[in-house]
Structures are given as structure tokens and as C-alpha cells.
Curated annotation (Swiss-Prot):
The keyword Protein biosynthesis does not apply. It is a multi-pass membrane protein. Keywords: Cell membrane, Membrane, Plasmid, Transmembrane, Transmembrane helix. The keyword Ribonucleoprotein does not apply. This is Uncharacterized protein y4fD. It is found in: Cell membrane.
Amino acid sequence: MTQETLRKLWITLAILTLVVMINIHGSTQKSDFALIIKLPIELKFDGELTREAYAVHGMRFFALFFWLVPFLAVYHAKRSSGSASEAFPFRLLDIEPRSRPGKWVQGIAFVVLICLPLLTAIHLWRIVVGMQVCQHVSNALVNCADIWSRPVNAGPWDDTYRLANWGPTYDPLVEPVLAVILTAVSVYLTLRLVIEMRRAGSRPVATGNTPAEPITTSVT
């Protein structure tokens, strides 16, 4: 895969992730603002969802998909050389990443496409850890407790646990542990990205194969 193809793949995934996270963040605040991207498929939540339900779905999306954004960026940076700003896979028109304006553009893109989703995840996580999860027994919710409690040995795909107030199905202990692990992976890859960008800046620019000097002969 060429660097150009990798950048196209990365920017597509990064923008889609950013749009979803911003929309979910706004939904937890009951905001009417939403970013819309026309796609062959539609990701849409029920307008009647509670704040906690949006937070649960947002953390699921973040944990499952966001780690790919810094992962691909790390892969791009490891194949780059000559400039830390050029190692970041964002490109805006024909602005040279090594130039002064280019460095500002790359820095802003890093904050928006990498840092903002992480900050949104922190916001969603603060909502999730304060939730109550209840056992679903005979069309009733009983034995409500926090997300780290699991009094019944239920399977991860059944309807044993739901959020209080008849929210979505949520598997306590299992889901938060997986979310913490995958979020930690995302944070690690983000830190690794910064390191690889610095390393790229210290590597000499790859110039490719230089043509051999012509052989000259002199006749005396």
C-alpha cells in the first residue's frame, strides 16, 4: 500500500469517527446540532434514547473502532522521514506539511482528529460509570447496581441486564472491562504516534536510488 492510499484510508476513517463522536457527544447534551455525511448506509439512533443510552452506544463505537485511527497513523509515520509534521497522514490541499503554515495545519488536525475523540470518550465514560444496571426478570428490572457488579452469571448476548429505566442491554463487568482495555490501546497508540512522528523527523529524507555517475574515459 502506498503512502497516498494509506492517507486516503486514514482520513476517511478519521473523519467518520470524528463525526459519530461529535454527534453522540451532542446527543448526551440534548443538543440539536449534528454533523451529517451522506453515505450508502446510515447510522442513526432513536431520538427517544436517554443520555445514558447515547453514552453506552458511544463508548461501544469508540472502543471498537477508534484505535484504528492512531494505528494507521503510526503505520504511516513509521514509513515517513524528514519531518514530524509530514509523518502525520493529514493533508490539506497542496499545503506543504514542512512549511510554517503546514505545521499549524498538521497540529490543528492532530487535535481535532485524534484528541477530540479521546476527550469525548472521557465525557462518555464519566456518564457510563455513574449508570445503574438492573437484572431483567419477568418484564421487571430488579437488583440494580453499578456497572462493575455482576450478581448473576449471565451470558454476554442475552437480555439478563439492562440499564435502569429500561435502557439498552448492557453486560456489567464484561463490557466496561473490554472498554477500558480497548481505550487503553487507543491511548497507547496515540502516544506511540507522537513518538513515531518525532522519530520520522530525525530520519534523513528518503531520496530513492540515485543514478550512477557516468563513466568517462580520456584518450591521450
